[in-house]
Amino acid sequence: MAAPIILFSFLLFFSVSVSALNVGVQLIHPSISLTKECSRKCESEFCSVPPFLRYGKYCGLLYSGCPGERPCDGLDSCCMKHDACVQSKNNDYLSQECSQKFINCMNNFSQKKQPTFKGNKCDADEVIDVISIVMEAALIAGKVLKKP
């Protein structure tokens, strides 16, 4: 039952202009934005809220490190690799290959109990759980839409 709800939410989310979601968001918290940004600092905010999640420099919706920026830790490196994979697939966020590689990378990070970056306020396993839910929805949507 949860999978269809997540899939519907995922498809609905990607069918709405992201800028439309930004309406009123800054009124609630001025640091929240859904515009494409690049980061030069390691962040850890909104750890359990997928649309606003900011982890490291590369983890988060429409959020990525600036060109040439090194990832903050192993989990952030997984996000950086996912960003690069999606970009190499003409920004196809439903790419089965990119989503599966990302999930595998995060699982590997978690299993090895790698350290997180200094100053991190998020529980890495919670961040992985949140991102994994979104990626599982992307995998389902990609299968439905027959994405490679």
Curated annotation (Swiss-Prot):
InterPro entries: PLipase_A2, PLipase_A2_dom_sf, PLipase_A2_His_AS. Residues 1-20 form the signal peptide. Optimum temperature is 30-40 degrees Celsius. Ca(2+) binds at Y58, G60, Y63, D83. Binds 1 Ca(2+) ion per subunit. Its cofactor is Ca(2+). Optimum pH is 8.5-9. The enzyme has a preference towards linoleoyl acyl chain over palmitoyl acyl chain. It also has a slight preference for phosphatidylethanolamine over phosphatidylcholine. This is Phospholipase A2-alpha.
